[in-house]
Amino acid sequence: MKKLGKAVLFCLILAVLLAFLNRILMPDTTFQADTEKIGDEVDYMVVGTSNVFYCVNPTVIWNEAGYTGYDLSLEQAPLIITYYQLKAELKKVKPETVFLDCAAFEYNYGIASMNQLALDKMPLSMDKLRLIKALGEDDKDHHIAEENKYSKINYLLPLHKFHDRWKEIFGGTLKSRYHEKYENTFAGYVATKDHFVYQNPHKWLPTMEEFGASFETNITDLNREYFEKIQALCAEHDVELILIKTPSKGWLLETHKNMKQFAEEEGLEFLDMNEETVIEALAIDEQVDFCDSSSHFNIYGTEKISRYLAEWMQTHQDYADKRVQGTGTNAYWNFLYADYLAFKNAED
Amino acid sequence: MTLVSVSFLIFLAAAVLVYYLTPQKGQWIVLLLASLVFYWLCSKGFLIFLLLFAGIIYVFARSFETGKKKLLVLLEVAILIVLLIVLKYAGWFGDGFVRFLSTISFQKPLSFVAPLGISYVLLTGIGYSVDVFRGTVTAEKNFLKVLSFLSFFPAITQGPINRFSDLSGQLMEGHRFSYEALVFGIQRMLWGFVKKLVIAGRLNVVMLELTGSWQGSKYSGAYVVLTVAICSLNIFMDFSGCMDIVIGAAEIFGIRLPENFDHPYLARSMPEFWRKWHITLGEWLRDYVMFSFTMSAPAKKMNKSLKGKVGRKTAAALVSIIGVLFVWLVFGLWHGISGTFLLAAAYYALLIIGGIVIEEPVKRFRSKYPQFTESKGFQIFRTVRTYFLGIPGAYLMLMPQVKSGLQFLATIFTRPAAQFVVKITEGEGAGTFLLGLDIYDFTVLILSLILWLVVTTLHRKKDVRIRLSNIHIVPRWAILLAVVIAVVLFGFYGDLNAGSFIYQGY
Amino acid sequence: MREKVLAILKEVNEEIPEYEGEGLLEDGIIASLDVIEIVSALEDEFGIVIAARNITKENFATVDSICALVESLQ
């Protein structure tokens, strides 16, 4: 019995040490909105992939229309992750509308290293375990990447993946808080002044032939399954679900048509910003507005897109202009916008 | 699930818990179930083939009780070997066959691999059959007991190759929980993790760097000698580390498995090296191949007729050379039907036969100059010589192709001075790289090799675990915690390809 | 009989009579090569047949165990 007590004590000490290591070695890539400060008066939420955090700037929408909302997104997030992220989020806040990024339909199980970022942010719960299980399960079409299969333990014990970051401690390069890329974030929006010129000279909404590469443009069974879960989740929380596609020169006409038909079948509104009328209204300058690809925008591009979205909300939704009413979180939103302006106007 | 995964640790813990909660009479059933579950988790539907092998082995062993034993034994061995070849080289039989096997195993065609450990089951099973045939053990009447012996899960992935007479009784008798066995078993496993994850993981990176991932290397000359040494050290750390994990895991259940390594690098001759390296395979080959041949009627007849003509010594040498050739042919083929393994086997066979040929002159030399040949210096010379004779074999085993592998070796002579000094180059991105490792990993490799040397030297005189248990609890726990944390931090795992063993492929 | 066995063993390998351990075969004092010579000589001397099943580390552990083996086969 005494020996057993000693063994338990030994394991406890070990567990504490490991938990400590886990804490210092797990990279913190937080760029999600601070829901504590935003409060529960939220008009909208934009969920999905990097196309969300590189396109929609909630502070600009606030400044334009007085609507509150934020981005909830992850690089290359598959719908599975979006679903569980949204599920957790809707327990905390109740937006009027959820805009679902259609780029998420391009992924199935996502990429393990990216998924890891979302999972590391989730406290242990049954939903987290369900998500981990879902990410490791093969569907009948074998969309799963090998690395995902083997990542369950990484998702569960981040130290398993990040243990070799001990080198960064010795090298003095351990960044415990932000990924460099996520240094300037505003309500889930990642601001950057980077600049990228897209070389392929085709028009917006190209056909597959014009684009010069072939893709799977149909919605996979897996994504349909998780889309339906998202739909049910929104219905349960009495939230309107809208499909959105931010501008991207890689978004094909075929995919657009499929998605449009899908939205009609599901009886959902579908805002595709790649349509000719929208593109004209946005007046995107292809020489100036992209940051690292034709679907990711720097602050100049995102301002155009966000302003357009604010106008669209004014004509299509009946959110209240909170600047007029004056609620408790106005100060925070004004601060966020000022903060963004300071970043924008700062000399590099 | 490999032996170095977190899932294996969880599985092992669960099995140990159930094992000791079960009355001793039923413990072997728990082990059998654990083995089957382990096999299922690793290989899914290939469990069928394990059962098939066990079934064949069981039925034949029973049949030896009556009838024409010799023919039956040959038939059994032939069936098992054909089955093994069909499974290991499914690709030869066309895509359709691979797809069929994939359906059985519930695995995608791309990730097709031969059933886990089936080569070890084959050796263990043939050993058991021959023992029954020779009458040294009696055939087990209960199929489940044979299955439990053949499938014992710690040993099924890479051995050691068990003997029925040594293991079966231990499996059946049941064991009372012993705190010491638990602690010692865990400590032995921990040491295996150090060797496999911390040392071999890094040696593997160095090996791949030096050989250009076997695709064509930018190194030459003296680096080739280094490569050969690294290859052999890598196999040793990988394989003996695995054995530490396997034997440690078995120890927790109160079961002692045979050792597979006994300081092979201290061997003073090639035969001694093979008594210290992959011991159970060496003994298997000696007992079931070598003696089967040399004690057979034709071999004895040959010996007798030669004796009159060339003398007793030479006759025995000639017969044993033929035996040696058989042994190494089996050795090469067992590792795989490929030129590289046959070449490695031929290399070892040549060394052993060379030893037989020069045995008499060496003996005469030794009795003539006893002071010299028994001096410490000469003994050290023998060890060093054996080491350098032995290590190229490991390289031959690891190289994927005969031609490119030998071309690389040839650069020792063709481009001897091309790169002699260890050069520190700037790698892509950050940090300085040394032989494929950054400065941190390189430091860890050197420090862990020193640690290995110290622990091994201490262990030769007295079991390190007993030494540990004799010191005060504070330094003891500090050491143990430090080693666990070192494995957690410095281990090579967590990646897709990490954690696979060299000897799992054979 | 023991003297005869000892003489055979000594002729094959001088180290055998001096060996004090309990694993002639296991420790490699008797190599596979020696086994052939020993078996052949014992068979001739005592008119017995030694089979593969008899070549175990237990039977070839010490000079005494070899004598016992010969005795059991006579």
Q: What role is predicted for each listed range?
A:
Chain C
Residues 48-73:
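C-terminal structural segments of small proteins and small subunits
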Residues 39:
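Short-chain dehydrogenase/reductase
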Residues 32:
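Catalytic nucleophile serine of serine hydrolases
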Residues 36:
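Conserved catalytic core of two-component sensor histidine kinases
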Residues 1-17, 68-74:
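Thiotemplate assembly-line natural product biosynthesis machinery
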Residues 10-29, 47-56:
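Phosphopantetheine carrier-protein modules
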